[in-house]
Design a protein with these regions (language model features):
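Conserved mixed alpha/beta catalytic, RNA-binding, or beta-rich assembly cores of soluble enzyme
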Residues: 86-154
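N-terminal start-of-chain detector that recognizes signal peptides
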Residues: 3-9, 29, 81-85, 101-102, ...
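A short linear-motif detector with a strong N-terminal bias
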Residues: 10-15, 37, 63-64, 88-91, ...
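Amphipathic repeat-derived elements
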Residues: 10-24, 92, 145-146
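N-terminal low-complexity or amphipathic/hydrophobic leaders
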Residues: 20-96
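Long, contiguous binding/interaction regions
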Residues: 2-15, 123
Length: 154
């Protein structure tokens, strides 16, 4: 079932869809989302620039603006993601269907390129479809920026 990007966001926003979007909007750009307070945003931006293979930056929002103006101007990043993992001090502390109650006026959102974007091309080429997405932590160090550092994940 291939929905348009607007249809999948609407289904998520209205509670008709929760979870991963793999196989649902396969012909559209899909992105990972990182949201940080403005005080941490510059360091993360530099981290993404230094490590563009593992953090391919698609868009950065203005502080407090939950709308990705370039990629999806009809989207609301507080409500239009299938499931949000809330990470504090490096650990997942909660998973919620929307983050309106958590949103702060100093939040900056980073949209990062995702392998979900090309998963449909793999299916079209005859590769078996899967609901899981593999991520692998390598032994390659990322170039640090401020408080952001670690091994490359692909």
């Amino acid at each position: 079932m291939d929905l348009s990007s607007i249809e999948i966001r609407e289904a998520i926003r209205t509670g008709k869809w929760e979870g991963m979007t793999v196989g649902r909007a396969g012909r559209y750009v899909q992105a990972g989302l990182v949201i940080l307070p403005k005080i941490q945003a510059y360091d993360f931006l530099v981290f993404c620039q230094r490590n563009s293979k593992s953090c391919p930056l698609l868009e950065v929002t203005d502080p407090g603006d939950p709308v990705p103006q370039q990629l999806a101007p009809s989207a609301d990043l507080r409500t239009d993601i299938g499931l949000y993992s809330i990470i504090r001090d490096g650990s997942v502390v909660d998973e919620v269907p929307d983050i309106r109650s958590l949103w702060q006026e100093d939040f900056v959102a980073f949209l990062l390129g995702s392998s979900l974007t090309f998963s449909q091309a793999l299916v079209d080429a005859g590769c078996t479809s899967s609901v899981g997405i593999g991520m692998y932590k390598t032994n390659i160090d990322c170039l640090p920026a401020g408080r952001f550092a670690g091994k490359m994940v692909v």
